[in-house]
Amino acid sequence: GDYVIFHELTHLLDTANLGAGDQKKNAMVRGFLEYHASQIETIKILGYESIGENISFSMKQQVETVASIKSMQNFVDEPANTAKSLLRRSDFPKDLETLLTTAALIFNYYGRRSICLMHAQDYREDVDIIEFSEFIGTAQLAALDTFL
């Protein structure tokens, strides 16, 4: 899907604009980059070209991902569910890569979720975010909601 290309291009653009440097050294910048790229990919997977369009959709709407066709609800919840399974591993965090991947998945979920909060007719919060708050911090996650 071309939504993946738009996700990665957003990372490139944001990195250039923010002068982010080494992403592994700045977790919040890395988090924002993932959050924003996930917003763009969500708009794109829904078939919209721009945030300026009149975006409206149902969480039951089917979207085609690289792996399969799934509902928007499943598309949005997928990174959260993967992050939760990583957080619940007895050896978490096994290594730096696992730690960074888990954080990226959480920010990815928040980016997708933000588009749903703003534009879905029937969005419901299915994911319990308590584990995310404990991992990333309540204040940081609350700050993401200010971007809505």
Predicted regions and their residues:
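Active-site recognition of the HExxH zinc-binding catalytic motif
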Residues: 2-19
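Catalytic micro-motifs at enzyme active sites that drive phosphoryl/nucleotidyl and oxygen chemistry
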Residues: 1, 22-26
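Short catalytic/ligand-binding loop motif for oxyanion handling, primarily in non-cytosolic enzymes
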Residues: 13, 21-23, 32
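Short alpha-helix boundary/capping elements
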Residues: 13-14, 45, 49, 111-114
